[in-house]
Amino acid sequence: VPATIRHLYFHIPFCPKLCPYCSFYVEVGGEHKTTAFLDALLAEVDHMRQRFELRPHTIYFGGGTPSALRIEQLDYLLSGLRARLDLSELREWDLEANPATIRQDKAKLLHALGITRLSLGVQSWDDDLLKVLGRVHNAAQAEQTVEILRDAGFTNLNIDLMFAVPGQTPTQWESTIAKTIALRP
């Protein structure tokens, strides 16, 4: 009997921009590589299915910025995985997202395809600190993204925050925590 794999992590290395603090493997842009990458990822899943029973409890898409994939790419990837994996015991399907890459149509598709939790890389609710971090979104856009995700049906959101950003004051951190709690992710 083959071993059963219960937890899967897929690294989607594509990003709209390299943030100065990032130490992960990323490809900025990379549009010309995306299709080949997704084909290779699904081929790897096919290969793994020959050796293991893939019946995950959790699936996590990290990066990079998985939400930077275009709608048709996300549909291809998620539909391809749904066709290849036994999801009967799936408890959580998480995807990391940058607020600048989520619009209503993408949020609705992600929810419809079974993503149960979005991990939103807000990092801060302070525009000055977001500039220090080199983020491509601002605080208002991040807050709007939370609303878009709620409207799409997401009830489980994770909001990533960064502490000890250069120049960050205790007051800014307290404000960030208060804002996050008020949004009830």
What feature does the model see in each segment?
Residues 1-9, 52-55:
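N-terminal [4Fe-4S]-dependent radical SAM core
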Residues 4, 17-20, 89-91, 155:
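Residue-level signal for beta-strand positions within conserved beta-sheet cores that form or flank
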Residues 26-51, 55-185:
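Conserved non-cysteine loop/helix-boundary elements of the Radical SAM core domain that shape
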